[in-house]
Amino acid sequence: MIKINDFNTQHISCEYADSVIKMERHFKMGNRYLSYILNERNFRDDIMLCPPSKLIKVIESFNLRFPDIDYDAEDWRYFRNYMIRQYERVRKGILHLVLNSLNLSVCPYCNRQYIFGTDNNRKVGAQFDHFYSKSKYPYLALSFYNLIPCCPTCNKAKGEECIEINPYIEGFENNGKLMVDSPLNCILRNADWEVKFKADDRCKTNIQAFALDELYKKHKDYAHEIVLKSVAYQKGYYNDLKISFRNIGITDETIER
């Protein structure tokens, strides 16, 4: 899993929020949940542009304001369905432009499938996952940093499942690495080797949600090629060191020690 480059996300997110506000000037009122996010909160700044690390605070504030939500009640179902409909309108009219602006070519969840935007509104080679489910947290349905551009495979795999790592904040970095469990067997093309993740608990949540272990096991040919190149590079680097140190009087025996 990779981090989404944030060099211009602030500009893009503001542009996105302003566009949505223009489209949705006439949000319907008369619902207590809508009244809360539109009147008691600054919908644009507090919710739509809420930084990814603070989305959980929005959830906590909402739960504090409405501690006893009846999820089967008519007012909640109206609010949920209304916010999801607004998202669907935005997705069709604006989000392909956001995707293009992010300059993101590969799915951040799996770092495997290519995604792309188009210059028209008919086709977008990515889907948008709600990091926090739009069904459970409809007030975040339009939050920019809750919308994760991803490939259809990852979007379907995750569904409404909660995961630990938001790619707007971080990727796996050094906490989730792909490893070859037996480099020697890999080099010799013996059957007994696998590509596996060495990961902490937070990364494991994402790995399980997107079945990344199974996905990367299918790429043993690529892993074999990478291991061979790594060995070749190290051998070439070692030979270069020997030549360089010989010139200053250091013997091969000393280098090998």
Which residue stretches match the model-derived regions?
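N-terminal accessory alpha/beta regions
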Residues: 1-95
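C-terminal, charged low-complexity interaction regions
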Residues: 2-33, 196-257
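Short, exposed beta-strand "edge-strand" segments with a Pro/Gly-rich flavor and a Y/T-containing core
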Residues: 43-50, 141, 146-150, 159, ...
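Short, intrinsically disordered, charge-biased short linear motifs at domain edges
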Residues: 91-98, 135-141
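Short cysteine-rich loop/turn motifs with clustered Cys
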Residues: 96-125, 151-153
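Histidine-centered nuclease catalytic patch
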Residues: 114-146, 160-166, 170-176
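Ligand/cofactor pocket segment of small-molecule handling proteins
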Residues: 134, 150, 154-157
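Domain-level detector of nuclease and nuclease-like folds
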Residues: 157-217
